Amino acid sequence: MSELCYIISGTGYTRCHSSFYQDNAVEKEKLNDIFKKVNQLTNHKFGALYNACTESNFGKRLMEFDAFSTIHADSGGLQIVTQGAEITEKLKNDVYHNQAKYSNLGMCFDEIPVTVADGRSSRNDTSGRIFDKDNFHVYAENTGKNLLDQINVFDK
């Protein structure tokens, strides 16, 4: 029989990162017990996802709950791009180090071969996005470089 792993996103809504749980061992254990109970209900594991860029303090706090089978860390690239901000080498490096330290699985900064008409786009709005087929290979090579950089940080 297959074993599934359910990864919760939006971990901020669990409030497990809040001072209420971080400063109160009894309440923290109660929350951990709730997470453990979920693991016992069906044939699946229970993991968590956080954004290593915008929620950089979540990974450390999620690791304190032993009920999570795995912790996944998103790069935050889409959120950065949709806000019209720039993804710098320093930002990527900071994210990679956070992922390596606090997660079991880190998602990379993938270069998406899309240009945005006005330089900014909401996450779900695709009306102003244009596929950049002429530079597809450049985006692919940049993604490969990002993966190599991430792997090198994880291997340290």
What name fits each language-model region?
Residues 1-155:
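Non-catalytic, usually N-terminal nucleic-acid engagement modules in DNA/RNA processing proteins
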